[in-house]
UniProtKB/Swiss-Prot annotation:
GO biological process: 'de novo' IMP biosynthetic process; adenine biosynthetic process
Catalytic activity reported: 2-formamido-N(1)-(5-O-phospho-beta-D-ribosyl)acetamidine + ATP = 5-amino-1-(5-phospho-beta-D-ribosyl)imidazole + ADP + phosphate + H(+)
Recorded family membership: Belongs to the AIR synthase family.
GO molecular function: ATP binding; phosphoribosylamine-glycine ligase activity; phosphoribosylformylglycinamidine cyclo-ligase activity
Protein name as it appears in the record: Phosphoribosylformylglycinamidine cyclo-ligase
Nucleotide-binding as UniProt keyword: yes
Organism: Xylella fastidiosa (strain 9a5c)
Length: 351
């Protein structure tokens, strides 16, 4: 039987329990100017409301909304260990906006979720500044978010991140893979590094190698290469779709599952892919990871982007003008394979 005790005469506050409302308010005021730089004319409200407002009227004739949500995996753990908080927000935005871009959609607005045990205003500001910058660079409004201070839920100095994006595309321009045909060409666009995938394996290899942060990888410190922000493909790809929409039958964002499992997601079930592994040279960081981790080729292909962050599935007679357009925007690219009709169950062949 539970015995009731006399209540303490010492008054308690929410701050005593570990939640500092004043710190949260200070954070909001600090990030307001950063967030406003990402706003678009369609944004109808500022920060602080119960719901964020976005006016879609007049922009599309027959809009289809495309939504996506993601995190940054255990790259976040590495960022916290290194005390590098200002670019992980760019990763968060990129993982979401690059996904919705695949269907030809323009990212409209973004919301973030930041959770921690004890709110550190400087750390949170650095993280959200990266989110705001990523949104600004994608033409996507950071329209709202949630900062959750939850005592006892996270160890000191740790936090978690999630993002949510809404995009729109004219129904007639929606890319769903249905136009893909045998003989279509795969154009691979360069990544900035591992982006935000495979970091549980990367961290294991890095730690097993003795955490060689300063190791020179072709003129760049290893840790700088590993922490390079995920490339934001939105603006150049939207521009490409505007000028060459008939040339592109499908697109793929190379994330978890690597080249093996992502491109095939946008290919009709009766077709497959032949990827030429010699069509491009994997960046040195992937060569180091494979060597140091003694990774099989198959493990590389299904874990990492291996230097290809985004793929266009294009009609063959438009490859040259697409390549020129990509060159004009400074995007390194290669013809990495073709769509074919498979015999048997193997739909993806890399060799």
């Amino acid at each position: 039987m539970t015995t009731l005790t006399s209540p303490s005469t010492t008054p308690l506050t929410y701050r005593d329990a570990g939640v500092d409302i004043d710190a949260g308010n200070t954070l909001v005021e600090r990030i307001k100017p950063l967030v406003k730089r990402s706003f678009r004319p369609e944004v109808m409200s500022g920060l602080g409301g119960f719901g964020a407002l976005f006016n879609l009227a007049g922009k599309y004739k027959e809009p289809v909304l495309v939504s996506g949500t993601d995190g940054v995996g255990t790259k976040l753990k590495l960022a916290q260990q290194l005390n590098r908080h200002n670019t992980i927000g760019i990763d968060l935005v990129a993982m979401c906006v690059n996904d919705v871009l695949v269907q030809g959609a323009e990212p409209l607005f973004f919301l973030d979720y930041f959770a921690t045990g004890k709110l550190d205003i400087d750390t949170a500001t650095a993280v959200i500044s990266g989110i705001a910058l990523g949104c600004e660079q994608s033409g996507c409004a950071l329209i709202g978010g949630e900062t959750a201070e939850m005592p006892d839920m996270y160890p000191p100095g740790e936090y978690d991140l999630a993002g949510f994006c809404v995009a729109a595309v004219e129904k007639s321009q929606l890319l769903d893979g249905s136009q893909v045909r045998e003989g279509d060409v795969l154009i691979g666009i360069a990544s900035s590094g591992p982006h935000s995938n495979g970091y549980s394996l990367i961290r294991r290899i890095y730690e097993r190698a003795g955490s060689p942060a300063d190791l020179d990888i072709h003129g760049t410190r290893l840790i700088d290469t590993l922490m390079a922000p995920t490339t934001l493909y939105v603006k150049p790809i939207l521009k490409l779709l505007h000028t060459h929409s008939d040339a592109i039958h499908a697109m793929a964002h190379i994330t978890g599952g690597g080249l093996t499992e992502n491109i095939i997601r946008v290919i009709p079930p009766n077709l497959g892919l032949r990827i030429d592994a010699n069509a491009w040279t994997q960046p040195p960081v992937f060569q180091w990871l494979q060597s140091e981790g003694a990774l099989a080729d198959t493990e590389m292909w299904r874990t990492f982007n291996c230097g290809i962050g985004f793929v266009l599935v294009a009609t063959p007679n438009q490859v040259a003008p697409l390549g020129q357009a990509l060159d004009n925007q400074g995007l390194a690219h290669w013809q990495i394979g073709r769509v074919f009709t498979p015999v048997g169950n193997e739909r993806v062949h890399i060799g």
